[in-house]
């Protein structure tokens, strides 16, 4: 458990951890490339390590260290055992598509209790459209998932754009194996597009080209067939999702902090946290590779469309508690499909602290109360809730006890130590 007490001031220099999204994609791409790739500044978090270990089961040789992962990619082989991806939904979804391209046999992918409840049916349906064979062992669209090796025989696949972007990423990373050119057709407006931009960016670095379909009245992507993944040296940038908690702490508390390893020209959608706090009234200094914050700032509630930034919702919920007026979060139905239902979890747990939050079908309405009280909070094994609630606890009267702090190892393994280094009053017990 994590015990958090009111923190009068934070000061110091921090580095945002490496991007989880970029690390996942880079290690999988490197494993598919015949040769050696050096991945610099990888995230050594539990989810990304799940991707690395799973890639080893498909034939890659990977030397892991804190500074660099050396990946020797090769032709995909049939795993010798069930592929257990732990708690990593990204690993499960991307490798469900990729595993169809082993030379023969079957792959079985599964994970922990939480993963075995995560929806997979839209991806399974899409892959089956391509002539591949994959299914849930329970016939309910959840893991364990069985995938048969096979050739892609149909080259147009339709999928909703408002489901998890990880499904579309999986298809994007699988279709280059097709002998023919392929097309992904989105049947509904796209959500979480920045994550697909990250996928396209990483694929490009590893020699695979994806084109956005610019035809009128047709939304989707075009992928050339017979493309080869090529090895490269790749440096992974800092993670704006994880930096959002540091930004929130900086604008809400008496602070003088510098957050390094976040880039002004990043393709990450969650860089929007900088614009959000600016619109709320914070004067944040954004530079080429770092952010400087001298708080606190008087914030005002605003309306925020979270279509492309679902991972920022817990951070926004905490910011809204300390803003004048109402903060409205909308277009966030997909936020319910993360590690937990984050809309319900934020409402339930922050309300225990005295927050005034109304849960809507697609979002939240947070009325600023400017004062929270310590409470015992559940986090539902969700790393983002642990970190967001920690910031709330640093501003609350009394003691806040947060369960499940171990989950931060997924995306920000050094979160507690980093926060303590700048003066945060937190302790693991």
UniProtKB/Swiss-Prot annotation:
Active site: 311 (proton acceptor)
UniProt-recorded name of the protein: 3-phosphoshikimate 1-carboxyvinyltransferase
GO terms for MF: 3-phosphoshikimate 1-carboxyvinyltransferase activity
Reaction equation(s) it catalyzes: 3-phosphoshikimate + phosphoenolpyruvate = 5-O-(1-carboxyvinyl)-3-phosphoshikimate + phosphate
Subunit structure: Monomer.
Protein's organism: Methanococcus maripaludis (strain C5 / ATCC BAA-1333)
Binding site for 3-phosphoshikimate: 20-21, 25, 164-166, 192, 311, 338
Pfam families: EPSP_synthase (PF00275)
Taxonomic path: Archaea, Methanobacteriati, Methanobacteriota, Methanomada group, Methanococci
UniProt superkingdom: Archaea
């Amino acid at each position: 458990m994590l015990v958090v007490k009111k923190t009068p001031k934070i000061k110091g220099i921090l580095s945002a951890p490496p991007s989880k999204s970029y690390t996942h994609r880079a290690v999988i791409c490197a494993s598919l490339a015949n040769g050696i790739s050096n991945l610099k500044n990888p995230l050594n978090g539990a989810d990304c390590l799940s991707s690395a270990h799973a890639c080893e089961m498909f034939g890659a040789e990977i030397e892991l260290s804190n500074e660099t992962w050396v990946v020797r990619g090769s032709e995909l082989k049939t795993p010798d055992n069930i592929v257990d991806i732990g708690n990593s939904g990204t690993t499960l979804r991307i490798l469900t598509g990729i595993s169809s391209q082993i030379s023969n046999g079957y792959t079985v992918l599964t994970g922990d209790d939480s993963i075995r409840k995560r929806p997979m049916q839209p991806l399974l349906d899409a892959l089956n459209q391509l002539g591949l064979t994959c299914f849930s062992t329970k016939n309910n669209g959840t893991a364990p998932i069985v995938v048969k090796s096979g050739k892609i025989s149909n080259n147009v696949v339709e999928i909703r754009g408002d489901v998890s972007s990880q499904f579309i990423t999986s298809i994007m990373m699988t279709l280059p194996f097709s002998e023919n050119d392929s097309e992904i057709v989105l049947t509904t407006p796209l959500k979480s597009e920045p994550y697909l931009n990250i996928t396209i960016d990483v694929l490009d670095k590893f020699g695979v080209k994806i084109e956005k379909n610019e035809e009128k009245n047709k939304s989707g992507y075009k992928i050339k067939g017979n493309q080869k993944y090529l090895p490269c040296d790749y440096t992974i940038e800092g993670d704006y999702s994880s930096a959002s908690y540091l930004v929130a702490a900086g604008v809400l508390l008496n602070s003088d902090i510098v957050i390094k390893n976040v880039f002004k020209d990043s393709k990450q959608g969650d860089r929007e946290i900088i614009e959000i706090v600016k619109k709320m009234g914070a004067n944040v200094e954004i530079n080429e590779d770092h952010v400087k914050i001298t708080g606190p700032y008087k914030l005002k509630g605003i309306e925020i469309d979270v279509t492309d930034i679902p991972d920022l919702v817990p951070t926004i919920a905490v910011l809204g508690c300390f803003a004048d007026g109402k903060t409205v979060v909308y277009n966030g139905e997909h936020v319910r499909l993360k590690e937990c239902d984050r809309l319900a979890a934020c409402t339930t747990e922050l309300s225990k602290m005295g927050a005034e939050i109304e849960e809507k079908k697609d979002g939240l309405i947070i009325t600023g109360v400017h004062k929270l009280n310590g409470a015992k909070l559940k986090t539902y094994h969700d790393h983002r809730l642990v970190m967001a609630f920690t910031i709330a606890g640093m501003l609350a009267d009394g003691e806040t006890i947060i369960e499940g702090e171990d989950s931060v190892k997924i995306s920000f393994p050094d979160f507690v130590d980093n926060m303590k280094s700048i003066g945060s009053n937190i302790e693991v017990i």
